[in-house]
């Protein structure tokens, strides 16, 4: 990942003894995160996944490549396979090297080509931090981001935008990017303030993860605020009339988490449900159970009766 200027966080603790050096935020901020992870590229060299598996890590964001073909990250396939074998949740990021939305679509298509249908637990992030990307102004930067993210979403993945706190504050129209998750880089001892909630926070570029450090001895470390620890339907039971629609609503905990949700119906011939939105359509008289599952694996059920 492109390195941005930042100041080193002072507090430092050792977790899992010598395996990981994590540079934590304040006690209040640290207590708020729901996952500890890191990001990887070819700059980290060949990863020792046996060592990484012993560390207290939940997820990893892996670079697919930069720009358009043929600039694939030479370690992508090995890193993906290694992360899966180590039991880590996996997301990816692709580096933006363009200045137009048309080119951004081409980058998204190249990213998808590299992914080649691989399953992901975390989003596909668009790494937007090169100055040329912002040369056309806020509106142009926004349409570049939207073009990439829409293409990723259309392929069934969760889109995300990565950049520094200052760029995220100044260079995007977030009203037009409501479906994009956010990954912020801010090397500070407090969680950065943004116009939108950050789903991932890269809080240091000078952490240490045994088995995955660069030749300079460092590894980017990341907090996740995405994962839900609980989920429930606001209405555990619902009665509908045939040929009507309703919206299934849920509440996830802790407050502020942005985990993804997936809805299914036990009997779609009676009640169909939109997998992503939870919109219900009553088709004929009968009963069905609607299930919602978070990305972290939490589940809840709702009973629906159609009359």
Enumerate the language-model features and the residues they cover.
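Functionally critical loop-and-helix segments that line ligand-binding/catalytic clefts
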Residues: 31-50, 54, 175-227
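Aromatic-lined carbohydrate-recognition surfaces of secreted/lumenal glycan-active proteins
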Residues: 156-169
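Bacterial N-terminal signal peptides that target proteins for export
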Residues: 2-14
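Glycine-rich, charge-decorated loop segments at or immediately adjacent to ligand/cofactor-binding or catalytic sites
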Residues: 103-106, 167-177
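Extracytoplasmic soluble-region selector
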Residues: 227-307
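Sec-dependent signal peptide cleavage junction
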Residues: 20-33
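Substrate-binding cleft of extracellular glycoside hydrolase catalytic domains
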Residues: 32-149, 153-157
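Bacterial N-terminal signal peptides
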Residues: 12-22
């Amino acid at each position: 990942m492109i390195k941005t200027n930042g100041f080193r966080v002072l507090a430092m603790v050792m977790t899992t003894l010598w395996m990981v050096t994590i540079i934590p935020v304040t006690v209040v901020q640290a207590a708020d995160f729901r996952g500890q992870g890191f990001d990887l590229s070819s700059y980290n060299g060949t990863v020792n996944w046996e060592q990484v598996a012993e560390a207290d890590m939940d997820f990893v964001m892996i670079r697919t490549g930069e720009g358009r073909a043929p600039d694939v990250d030479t370690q992508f396939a090995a890193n993906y396979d290694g992360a899966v074998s180590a039991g880590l949740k996996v997301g990816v990021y692709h580096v933006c090297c363009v200045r137009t939305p048309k080119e951004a679509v081409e980058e998204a298509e190249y990213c998808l080509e590299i992914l080649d249908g691989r399953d992901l637990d975390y989003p596909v992030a668009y790494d937007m931090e090169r100055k040329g990307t912002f040369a056309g102004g806020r509106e142009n930067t926004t349409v570049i981001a939207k073009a990439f993210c829409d293409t990723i979403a259309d392929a069934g993945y969760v889109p995300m935008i990565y950049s520094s706190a200052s760029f995220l504050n100044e260079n995007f129209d977030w009203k037009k990017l409501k479906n994009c998750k956010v990954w912020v880089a801010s090397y500070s001892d407090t969680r950065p303030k943004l116009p939108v909630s950050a789903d991932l926070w890269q809080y240091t570029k000078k952490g240490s993860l045994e088995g995955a450090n660069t030749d300079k001895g460092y590894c980017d470390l990341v907090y996740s605020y995405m994962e839900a620890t609980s989920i429930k339907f606001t209405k555990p039971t619902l009665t509908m009339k045939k040929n009507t629609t309703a919206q299934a609503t849920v509440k996830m905990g802790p407050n502020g988490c942005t985990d993804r949700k997936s809805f299914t119906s036990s009997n779609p011939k009676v009640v169909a449900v939109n997998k992503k939105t939870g919109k219900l359509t009553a088709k004929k008289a009968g009963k069905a159970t609607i299930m919602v599952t978070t990305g972290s694996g939490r589940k809840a059920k709702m009973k629906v009766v159609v009359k």
